[in-house]
Amino acid sequence: MSTILKSLPQGENVGIAFSGGLDTSAALLWMKQKGARVFAYTANLGQPDEADYDEIPRKAMEFGAEKARLVDCRSQLVHEGIAAIQAGAFHVSTGGIAYFNTTPLGRAVTGTMLVSAMKEDGVNIWGDGSTYKGNDIERFYRYGLLTNPDLRIYKPWLDQQFIDELGGRAEMSAFMTAAGFAYKMSSEKAYSTDSNLLGATHEAKDLERLDSGIKIVNPIMGVPFWRDDCAVKAETVAVRFVDGQPVALNGQTFADPVALFLEANAIGGRHGLGMSDQIENRIIEAKSRGIYEAPGMALLHIAYERLVTGIHNEDTIEQYRISGMRLGRLLYQGRWFDSQALMLRETAQRWVARAITGEVTLELRRGNDYSILNTESPNLTYAPERLSMEKVEDAPFTPADRIGQLTMRNLDITDTRAKLDIFAKAGLLSAGEGSHIPKLESDKG
């Protein structure tokens, strides 16, 4: 049996991820009028642009929902966000500035928690507003079926009858008005925005053009730091971790991780920290472009990675970065709870994060401009006396020790020379004058 329904299942319980916006409001009312028993579920993800969460379920009931629930997802979202920081699960970056996968993290939490709530209410059909060209249709599909194997999927935006009758925002607005709901369309922005407590995504419309950039965006979690009339003062902030968990900001300890994240967002947001412009590969391998905000994620990530580099050895750091790239891609693809992702994630949390205890002090300026002022940790393996250029007592090694170490390198150097000679004879290298490879004397003549 197909899990995707192409037309509305009349007379059955259908759950809809309800945002309260025009699209989902029109979809809910339309499904009700066509004979479905509609249940509305709203995820409280701490969206910074949402003024009143309690109003959303009330709207759903007005539009004909059998039941409307507000599901608080904030604690779980922050839990997953911290896990992503611990594992470095960020695979998209430009010029060293990362996209913190805030939308994929939000989808992982929304997809599992809303479907769990639906299952409690005996609702085994789920609809949402994702379109067939985006990533979310696949993310929600995976997370929904992982949570409820009996789930069937109905998306109004894949139903040709819905598209024919309510194919655009003007048609939806007229439909709502005709039904007695004076639903006024919000003014159209030059881009669309999706947000949660961890970050905001701005994309589509004018932002699809690469000659239209960050300057057309009105940040919702920070400040437009690129504007001359935007005053941004330098600020010092201290971030403390214990066993890989962020616990304090500027000496204030937080028992509630959600409260800590809200404060981290406020601090980073005052500077526009964590804003980035990325070109990425969607799940279907087509490229898309987004402008992202993630002030709290960026602040915690910077401090965490500073401690990682001061505590762990080179091979561990290398594995952390390689695994983090892979895990970030799995997260982006909607596979955050797949076994291969759990394996990578738990490894980083167990063998990297558990050693991360300490405090990092930074000076934040404009945007992603910052300086690290101090790093403290009882677990630091950074020991300046080991490599001090000054004369020290009880030096860890002597000139004679280094001579012996370099002599051992002769084995590797000899082998490397032999390989280069093979490559040169095969025509793969041009050695000598006019080449970037220096002329090498062959041991064999």
Swiss-Prot record:
It is an enzyme of class 6 (ligase). It is found in: Cytoplasm. It comes from the Bacteria. GO terms for biological process: argininosuccinate metabolic process; L-arginine biosynthetic process; urea cycle. Keywords: Amino-acid biosynthesis, Arginine biosynthesis, ATP-binding, Cytoplasm, Ligase, Nucleotide-binding. Its EC number is 6.3.4.5. Pathway: Amino-acid biosynthesis; L-arginine biosynthesis; L-arginine from L-ornithine and carbamoyl phosphate: step 2/3. L-aspartate binds at T131, N135, D136. GO terms for molecular function: argininosuccinate synthase activity; ATP binding; protein homodimerization activity. L-citrulline binds at Y99, N135, R139, S192, T201, E203, E280. ATP binds at A17, F18, S19, G20, G21, L22, D23, T24, S25, A43, G129, T131, D136, D194. GO terms for cellular component: cytoplasm. It catalyses: L-citrulline + L-aspartate + ATP = 2-(N(omega)-L-arginino)succinate + AMP + diphosphate + H(+). Belongs to the argininosuccinate synthase family. Type 2 subfamily. Homotetramer. NCBIfam families: argG, PRK05370.1. This is Argininosuccinate synthase. It comes from Rhodopseudomonas palustris (strain BisA53).
